[in-house]
């Protein structure tokens, strides 16, 4: 009995250590998924007509902001070594029109990057990457991905409130 207990405890310890191995990636994935989910909820709450609304000339419209998020997801993943899936042309994303098409493109990019977060290995987190706007390690790239989605969630909340749209999680 004592040997079984020791074996079970050893197995538990090994499993716990492995769970900690990807703690940073799992935490980032969780926060990123939450931000992405709320951005999609906001995207769905806007009417088709509101997708063309912009706070001022020269500022991104609702639809443009959503497509920017989708495009940036692919861009950041690409810089970390994960090219976009077959059939996705990053340069064509800004040309997508229509609420349903924009939401579909956003959801596809969200799913893609969530799948890639856990593929970044611990021994790669310190590797330097030139993102074009900054040089940082892959950990910084994962954090930038999470922060960027959160930044535009805030932008879209302001857009929603300006148009009388209540964020669905605030009701």
Task: List PLM regions with ranges.
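Short leucine-rich amphipathic alpha-helices used at interfaces
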Residues: 21-22, 28-30, 72, 79, ...
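A short, mixed-charge helix-start or loop-turn motif at secondary-structure junctions
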Residues: 21-25, 91-99, 135-139
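Short, solvent-exposed, charged loop/turn and helix-capping segments
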Residues: 46-49, 120-121
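Short, contiguous alpha-helical
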Residues: 29, 33, 37-40, 48-91, ...
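Bacterial Sec-dependent N-terminal signal peptides
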Residues: 1-23
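Acidic/histidine-rich alpha-helical segments that form the ligand environment
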Residues: 95-129, 140-148
């Amino acid at each position: 009995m004592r040997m079984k207990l020791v074996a079970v405890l050893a197995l538990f310890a090994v499993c716990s250590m492995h769970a900690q191995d990807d703690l940073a990636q799992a935490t980032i994935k969780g926060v990123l998924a939450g931000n992405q989910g709320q951005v999609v909820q906001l995207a769905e709450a806007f009417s088709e007509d509101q997708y063309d609304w912009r706070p001022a000339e020269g500022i991104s419209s609702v639809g443009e902001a959503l497509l920017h998020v989708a495009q940036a997801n692919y861009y950041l993943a690409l810089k970390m070594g994960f090219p976009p899936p077959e059939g996705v042309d990053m340069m064509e994303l800004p040309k997508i029109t229509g609420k349903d098409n924009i939401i579909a493109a956003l959801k596809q990019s969200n799913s893609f990057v969530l799948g890639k977060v856990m593929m970044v290995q611990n021994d790669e987190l310190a590797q330097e990457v030139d993102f074009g706007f900054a040089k940082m390690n892959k950990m910084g790239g994962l954090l930038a991905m999470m922060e960027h989605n959160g930044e535009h969630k805030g932008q879209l909340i302001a857009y929603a409130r300006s148009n009388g749209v209540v964020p669905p999680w605030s009701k």
